[in-house]
Amino acid sequence: MASSAVQICSNALLLLGDKPINSFDEGYDRALLCSNLWDNARQAVLRAHPWNCAKARVSLAPETETPAFDWSYQFALPGNCLRVLFVGETGVPEDYTIEGRRILADVNPLYLSYIYDNEDVASWDALLIETMQRYMAFSMAYPLTKSATLRDSMYQEYANLLKSAKAVDGQEEPPETVGDSPFIDVRR
């Protein structure tokens, strides 16, 4: 199993029928292409699904400056936040909005669950690694081969693998339960 960005990119190159690389700094066009695409590709694939290996939780304190209207507090999103999953605690969602890199809400503190930019490939699930290899192959297919057909084929492989990986990754989560709510209590 690939345990580094370079190994993932090498495997993606092999999927395209190209030679592997040993480093992003090799001086070959394919190594430079891998290096240029890696960060954005990683972030796109991590954003595509709430991967268990890229989830984080944090309690945020409000900034000193308050929003001009509608909301009582504003909170800076963590620097490594790629996607907000949930705002609130104990299964009770809070109302909020996102503006730029800030969350506006009427609660203090703000409990945030999110996807972070997990750069530690060694901590990734095997299916996430396979999915990332297909995404890199898709991203590099046209620049390396000038073949739209190969690019489209690699995208289809990526999409199919992502679908399977989401199903497997999602099965590791316990089933969602209905949290405490005044609306639910009335029904009991």
Give residue ranges: language-model regions.
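N-terminal start-of-chain detector that recognizes signal peptides
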Residues: F24-E26, R83-F86, P109
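Short, extreme N-terminal leader segments that mark the start of a protein/domain
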Residues: M1-N36
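Generic, ordered loop/turn and secondary-structure boundary motif
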Residues: N22-D25, N52-A54, S59, I184
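Internal mixed-charge
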Residues: A2, Q7-I8, T90-R188
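Hydrophobic/aromatic-lined pockets within catalytic cores
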Residues: L13-I21, R42, L46, P50, ...
